């Protein structure tokens, strides 16, 4: 018994490990793994089907084919365990050793490992500093390489062709050594002195200045150092021994019909062995050189194919013309080891079936078909049957279950009670795609799902399928109940709003129930309470919509949290009073005293959750659903064709539009408008007509006229079914109703351009053939787009998860004072997102002061919940500095304070929460709702007319920021600064509106002045950019020579003449170096200085500038000297939707990025080249000026002599995030990415909390480049993990040494994922070969910090419930204790074992 125990214990030992190291294997190491050399290419004997000796499946090397039985059958059974049979040489043991025992092949000639040769950059090439082409020519026996030059004039590593080699042999004899093939490369690698080489390179690095050379040297130094530090030897990149995979990992399976299916690896190994044996024989026979050489080359090719088929030359194909799957293919790609078997596994105890509605279920239940339950809970049933003594053995229990005896069903009921199951719907885009429910047994074969969780699963009942999984262990059940139960997931992790919200029928029912109707039956009654209201409705004495007075008792929480009753008479309707009966105590009646649409219901649930907490909300949600379904049925709302009322005015609106179009067509034919203008105008006309039709239609549907009690006519909101569905938010929208009853409108071609003839018909009238044909265009594109979108969105999610997967909350507070300023999002005249929405659930980074005072309103480190936000609003605070994950100081992970509230739970986040994955899911999940298209500007699609003025909407005072201005002759302010912002401040000091004011705008109101709503405060000419003078005086022309630098033009219509400055390309040779300018002088002809500087007022004019002044005229400050025509920038495409989000997270540079000032200083222009201008910025403090070449066609925003600040825009365009980071810092780039991503999502009406985007930005910023190494051991220009630099600097500063200086890097998410510290995580993401090659050469250690690495090695993840386990292990390791292994004595164990063997599977009662 005891040795059986020992034996069992030996079988189940698990390795405790903290890190995984990858390195090159030395030949000795490979031999030490091996259990014998494979010498023959044979696999199994075709007659006996036994493995051949010394073959690829040899039992002597790899172990027995049957458990505890040798091959010849001499020794069988357990008692001979460990004996080696003398007849067939097979050890008697378990078969499963055939999965772990390796063999080896001794190669007759060394071969290069293709990964280190061909995986770019070639490691062998870098190490030897030879080009890859040369190395390949040596390896594949085309040329010789000199290994030892000796006393000759041949250099080491010199490449010799056949002829050169023979010549050298004649000349020098055996003075020198040159070889070909892998032996040559191996000899070269062996004779390298890595440390000396390293020294030499470092010296070179210090001497050289050229950038390319430095780069190359740093690369080599890094590689050499990696070899030195990791203890890898370079010659190990050449294989002399080839390991052979255990046979059960490359199986050979007999098919029926006597054929065999085999793994491709066997073919590849067979090739290697055949060629190797042939080469050995040739060497023994001392065959001619050329034959041996050919055989060696073939061996090299065979080994290449085995390791990575198709990497070099054509892939070796099998019998069916398909390339063979090599070792490298086994691990990479979606079907490879990582993604198929390690990151995703099939699980047992699971089933799947179609889903149907379970409208009678409670929120925490799901209906499980009895058949499925019986199958899924089998082990529990067997155990219970035995425990009850209803079955003596497991076999008997099995029989009972198979016969489905009556008692089995009772047992099943018991087993299932309070045993949660998990329901999952693919695709699982966020964590709410798997939730736990308590099963309720049902007849039939479909799973029943609670309607309210459909939104979270994105499920509908048109044939969707769902999978059921059973959590087996007690811990798993506990986790499922405490964390994954549907009742615990009421709020969405993406935005903190309820995700359990009624939709469709329920909304319609509640809306119908809470509508009011003029002169309904029972109007004007006074009722004693909701009970009476219900009685009257049920007996038919009052209509659901009757306006009545009802006595209502509300309960409100007082300061102590006690409920206080308050009764009053309310004007309401019968339906609302009935609905009040299900509303939990503590909510105000006003919440139901309105027509409830979808938004109102969602708000109602949210309020309930915030005031009363989880349990009442769940009960309330269920009640809402039951009530909604009941009254939707009562309403009898149905759609008939007469509900689609076509407006009478439709016909005349369309004929008016047609007349306008005809007129424009005439203008076009007479040449007054261009084809483009005509197209745009036609589209505008039709878009306007469409809007008018749909407005007329909605007005028509919206109201109906009824007779009230006094016999007068009165308008009321209509009870039209279609209108009710759209108005309540149950189904449909105004746009869809427009297609049913208005006109379908303009259609787009697949390329996105708009067809100029609209579809004037609607679906009620029906479409004619042409209209139908035009419609198919758009419909088909929609379908193609959807398919594309799903794949793209899935890939984006995968990249996001990969970059953020190792980010976990690891401490409570990192103590930083850093943070980001939060202000409301204001675009033009409307607040897109108020401040409270942005700061809710964040932690303040500094004390928030009461505006205008020094009183602290909210102290530092406060989690801002709803009540705090109300306080901020009351005191009209419009900017709050909050903590952010981007500025968090925690080394690995982030702290709870920088993250703030856990959106799905409503309290501050717990330690161990995997915020990275949550962020990735929250951003990726709505990806499928985003559009795929790029918007072309033009047509009605998205035409913003060039703005030429600012008109405010609200009254208040004006506040200008970063403004320079002058006062012109009429006393108005003229703006002379570039990025001026105009804000409208209301009487409480809150920013209501915000506008950008361009250079040259004339302001009607000054800074701080009051304006009324609707007033125009600024205007400008959108088509030209003026040059404004800042001083008064007389104009003097400099270098303005007619015919050389300027030309005169006279306008035909007005007869005014103007001067146009010629572009440098149009000038004569003499005019090339002239710089046309306007100088301002005083009456005596002396220069006038620009106020505040010592520079004369001189304005250089760029090409194409138009001057309408004559030399010597008097001007005053604020006047326009010249105008520069602007090309209309309206033809660029705006990338929108999903591609835009991907571009932002990949940190791609836009095509023509904005040019930003690298330093602060004064702008001037240097010598021009053919196509470029030289921009020079001279700093004021006299340090070195900065020069940049800018293409001539770029429009510059700055004039010569103007002062710019670092990071100012010099030339317009989309800004590149890298530039923002470099010039304006981390916070600016965070703000930029967050705002840009939010813009895309906001357009689609998707709410995502900013935190999630910040989390991804933090991960994009996790690398830094060393600028100056200081006393640290980093290399200059090396890219290192930001946290590593921080830790190193902290240690250096503690020792009083100089830390390293660095600049933060912004990496795109793909790059960032591949650059992670963990090679396992990177390899399982993309480019597996490259990642593993790099890691092996450097001998990398994977500390297993992230989630992915731990999943792959099969451990609990260091997040969630696994966080405690990992913390515990770290504590123990720090204390130097042994890992807690279960200590069992043999006696205890044998007793319990005996019990087990006798009892079978006896579970206990508390299952």
From Swiss-Prot:
Binding site for Zn(2+) 2: 814, 888, 895, 898
Record note on cofactor: Binds 1 Mg(2+) ion per subunit.
GO terms, molecular function: DNA binding; DNA-directed RNA polymerase activity; magnesium ion binding; zinc ion binding
Assembly mode: The RNAP catalytic core consists of 2 alpha, 1 beta, 1 beta' and 1 omega subunit. When a sigma factor is associated with the core the holoenzyme is formed, which can initiate transcription.
Residues where N6-acetyllysine is found: 972
SUPFAM superfamilies in the cross-refs: beta and beta-prime subunits of DNA dependent RNA-polymerase
A Pfam family of this chain: RNA_pol_Rpb1_1
Functional summary from the UniProt entry: DNA-dependent RNA polymerase catalyzes the transcription of DNA into RNA using the four ribonucleoside triphosphates as substrates.
Keywords on record: Acetylation, DNA-directed RNA polymerase, Magnesium, Metal-binding, Nucleotidyltransferase, Transcription, Transferase, Zinc
Name of the protein in its database record: DNA-directed RNA polymerase subunit beta'
Enzyme Commission (EC) number: 2.7.7.6
Domain of life, source organism: Bacteria
GO biological process: DNA-templated transcription
One GO CC term, this protein: DNA-directed RNA polymerase complex
Entry-linked InterPro entries: DNA-dir_RpoC_beta_prime, DNA-dir_RpoC_beta_prime_bact, RNA_pol_asu, RNA_pol_N, RNA_pol_Rpb1_1, RNA_pol_Rpb1_3, RNA_pol_Rpb1_3_sf, RNA_pol_Rpb1_4
Reactions performed catalytically: RNA(n) + a ribonucleoside 5'-triphosphate = RNA(n+1) + diphosphate
Keyword Nucleotidyltransferase: yes
UniProt enzyme class: transferase
SMART domains linked: RPOLA_N
Organism: Shigella flexneri serotype 5b (strain 8401)
Taxonomic lineage of the native organism: Bacteria, Pseudomonadati, Pseudomonadota, Gammaproteobacteria, Enterobacterales
């Amino acid at each position: 018994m005891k040795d059986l125990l020992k034996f069992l214990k030996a079988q189940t030992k698990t390795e405790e490990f903290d890190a995984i190291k990858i390195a090159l294997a030395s030949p000795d190491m490979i031999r030490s793994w091996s259990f014998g050399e494979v010498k023959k290419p044979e696999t199994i004997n075709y007659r006996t089907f036994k493995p051949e000796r010394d073959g690829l499946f040899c039992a002597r090397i790899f172990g027995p084919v049957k458990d505890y039985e040798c091959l010849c059958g001499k020794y069988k059974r357990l008692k001979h365990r460990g004996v080696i049979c003398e007849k067939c040489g097979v050890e008697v043991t378990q078969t499963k050793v055939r999965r772990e025992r390796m063999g080896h092949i001794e190669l007759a000639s060394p071969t290069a490992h293709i990964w280190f040769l061909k995986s770019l950059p070639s490691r062998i090439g870098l190490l030897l500093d030879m080009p890859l082409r040369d190395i390949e020519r040596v390896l594949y026996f085309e040329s010789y390489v000199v290994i030892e030059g000796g006393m000759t004039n041949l250099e080491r590593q010199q490449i010799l062709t056949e002829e050169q080699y023979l010549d050298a042999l004649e000349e020098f004899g055996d003075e020198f050594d040159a070889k070909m093939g892998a032996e040559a490369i191996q000899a070269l690698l062996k004779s390298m002195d890595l440390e000396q080489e390293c020294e030499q390179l470092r010296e070179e690095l210090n001497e050289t200045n050229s950038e390319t050379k430095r780069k190359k040297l740093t690369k080599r130094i890094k590689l050499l150092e990696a070899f030195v530090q990791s203890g890898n030897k370079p010659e190990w990149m050449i294989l002399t021994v080839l390991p052979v995979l255990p046979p059960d990992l490359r199986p050979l399976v007999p098919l029926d019909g006597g054929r065999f299916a085999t793994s491709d690896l066997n073919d590849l190994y067979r090739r290697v062995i055949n060629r190797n044996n042939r080469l050995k024989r040739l060497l023994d026979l001392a065959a001619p050189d050329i034959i041996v050489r050919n055989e060696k080359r073939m061996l090299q090719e065979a080994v290449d194919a085995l390791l990575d088929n198709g990497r070099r030359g054509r892939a070796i194909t099998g019998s069916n013309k398909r390339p063979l799957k090599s070792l490298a293919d086994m691990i990479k790609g979606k079907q490879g080891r990582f993604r198929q078997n390690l990151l995703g596994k099939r699980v047992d105890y699971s089933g799947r079936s179609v889903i149907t509605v379970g409208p009678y279920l409670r929120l925490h239940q799901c209906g499980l078909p009895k058949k499925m339950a019986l199958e899924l809970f089998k082990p529990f049933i067997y155990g219970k049957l035995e425990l009850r003594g209803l079955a003596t053995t497991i076999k008997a229990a099995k029989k009972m279950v198979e016969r489905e005896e009556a008692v089995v069903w009772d047992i099943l009921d018991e087993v299932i009670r309070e045993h949660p199951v998990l329901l999952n719907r693919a695709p699982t885009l966020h964590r709410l795609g798997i939730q736990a429910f308590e099963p309720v047994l049902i007849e039939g074969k479909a799973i029943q799902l609670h309607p309210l969780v459909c939104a979270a699963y994105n499920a509908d009942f048109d044939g969707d399928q769902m999978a059921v999984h059973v959590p087996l262990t007690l811990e798993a059940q506990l986790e499922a109940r405490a964390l994954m139960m549907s009742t615990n997931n009421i709020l969405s992790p993406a935005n903190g709003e309820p995700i359990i919200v009624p939709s469709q029928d329920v909304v319609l029912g509640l809306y119908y129930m809470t509508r009011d109707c003029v002169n309904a039956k029972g109007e004007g009654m006074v009722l004693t309470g909701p009970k009476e209201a219900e009685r009257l409705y049920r007996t038919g004495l009052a209509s659901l919509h009757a306006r009545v007075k009802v006595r209502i008792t509300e309960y409100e929480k007082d300061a102590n949290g006690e409920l206080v009753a308050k009764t009053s008479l309310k004007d309401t309707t019968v339906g609302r009073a009935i609905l009040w009966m299900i509303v939990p105590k503590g909510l105000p009646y006003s919440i139901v005293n309105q027509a409830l649409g979808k938004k109102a219901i969602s708000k109602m649930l949210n309020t309930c959750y915030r005031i009363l907490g989880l349990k009442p909300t769940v009960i309330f949600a269920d009640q809402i659903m039951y009530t909604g379904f009941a009254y939707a049925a009562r309403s009898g709302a149905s759609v008939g064709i007469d509900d689609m009322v076509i407006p009478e005015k439709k016909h005349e609106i369309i004929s008016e539009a047609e007349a306008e179009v005809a007129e424009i067509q005439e203008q076009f034919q007479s040449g007054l408008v261009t084809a483009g203008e005509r197209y745009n105008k036609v589209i505008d006309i039709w878009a306007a007509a469409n809007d008018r039709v749909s407005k007329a239609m909605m007005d028509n549907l919206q109201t109906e006229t009824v007779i009230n009690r006094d016999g007068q006519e009165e308008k009321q909101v209509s009870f039209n079914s279609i209108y009710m569905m759209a108005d309540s938010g149950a189904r449909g929208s105004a746009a869809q109703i427009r297609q049913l009853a208005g006109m379908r409108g303009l259609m787009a071609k697949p390329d996105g351009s708009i067809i100029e003839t609209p579809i004037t018909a609607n679906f009620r009238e029906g479409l004619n053939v042409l209209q139908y044909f035009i419609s198919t265009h758009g419909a088909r594109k929609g379908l193609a787009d959807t398919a594309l979108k799903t794949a793209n969105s899935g890939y984006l999610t995968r990249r996001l998860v990969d970059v953020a997967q190792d980010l976990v909350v690891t401490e409570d507070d990192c103590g930083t004072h850093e943070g980001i300023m939060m202000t409301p999002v204001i675009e033009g005249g409307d607040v897109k997102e108020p401040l409270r929405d942005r700061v809710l659930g964040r932690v303040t980074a500094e004390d928030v002061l009461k505006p205008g005072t020094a009183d602290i309103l909210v102290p530092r480190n406060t989690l801002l919940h709803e009540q705090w936000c109300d306080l901020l609003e009351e005191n009209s605070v419009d900017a709050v500095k909050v903590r952010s994950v981007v500025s968090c100081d925690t080394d690995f992970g982030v702290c709870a304070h920088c993250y703030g509230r856990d959106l799905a739970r409503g309290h501050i986040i717990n330690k161990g929460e995997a915020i990275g994955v949550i962020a990735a899911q929250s951003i990726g999940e709505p990806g499928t709702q985003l559009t795929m298209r790029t918007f072309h500007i033009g047509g009605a699609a998205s035409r913003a007319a060039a703005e030429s003025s600012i008109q405010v909407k609200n009254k208040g005072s004006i506040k200008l920021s970063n403004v320079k201005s002058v006062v012109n002759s009429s006393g108005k302010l003229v703006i002379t600064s570039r990025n001026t912002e105009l804000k409208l401040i209301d009487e409480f000091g809150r920013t209501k509106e915000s506008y950008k004011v361009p250079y040259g705008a004339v302001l009607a109101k000054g800074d701080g002045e009051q304006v009324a709503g609707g007033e125009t405060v600024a205007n400008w000419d959108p088509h030209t950019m003026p040059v404004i003078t800042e001083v008064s005086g007389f104009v003097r022309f400099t270098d303005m020579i007619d015919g050389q630098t300027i030309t005169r033009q006279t306008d035909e219509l007005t007869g005014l003449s103007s001067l146009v400055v010629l572009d440098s390309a149009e000038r004569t040779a003499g005019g090339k170096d002239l710089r046309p300018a306007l100088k301002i002088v005083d009456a005596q002809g002396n220069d006038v200085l620009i106020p505040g500087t010592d520079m004369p007022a001189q304005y250089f004019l760029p090409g194409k500038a138009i001057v309408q002044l004559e030399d010597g005229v008097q001007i005053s400050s604020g006047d326009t000297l010249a105008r520069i025509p602007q090309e209309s920038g309206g033809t660029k495409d705006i990338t929108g939707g999903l591609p835009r989000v991907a571009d932002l997270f990949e940190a791609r540079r836009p095509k023509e990025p904005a040019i930003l000032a690298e330093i602060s200083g004064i702008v001037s222009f240097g010598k021009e080249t053919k196509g470029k201008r030289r921009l020079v910025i001279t700093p004021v403090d006299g340090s070195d000026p900065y020069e940049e070449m800018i293409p001539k066609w770029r429009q510059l925003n700055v004039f010569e002599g103007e002062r710019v600040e670092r990071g100012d825009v010099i030339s317009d365009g989309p800004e590149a995030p890298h530039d923002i980071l470099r010039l304006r810092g981390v916070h600016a780039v965070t703000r930029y990415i967050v705002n840009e991503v939010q813009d895309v999502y906001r357009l689609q009406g998707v709410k995502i909390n900013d935190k999630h985007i910040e989390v991804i930005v933090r991960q994009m910023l996790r690398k830094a480049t060393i600028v100056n190494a200081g006393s640290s051991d980093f290399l200059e220009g090396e890219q290192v993990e930001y946290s590593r630099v921080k830790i190193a600097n902290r240690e250096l500063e503690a020792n009083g040494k100089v830390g390293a200086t660095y600049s933060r890097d912004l990496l795109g998410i793909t790059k960032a994922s591949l650059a992670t510290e963990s090679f396992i995580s990177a390899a399982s993401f993309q480019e597996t070969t490259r990642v593993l090659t790099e890691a092996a050469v450097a001998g990398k250690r994977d500390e297993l910090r992230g989630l992915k690495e731990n999943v792959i090695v099969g451990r609990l993840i260091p997040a969630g419930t696994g966080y405690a386990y990992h913390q515990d292990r770290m504590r123990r390791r720090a204390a130097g204790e042994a890992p807690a292994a279960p200590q069992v004595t043999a006696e205890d164990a044998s007793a319990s074992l005996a019990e087990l063997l006798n009892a079978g599977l006896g579970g206990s009662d508390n299952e």
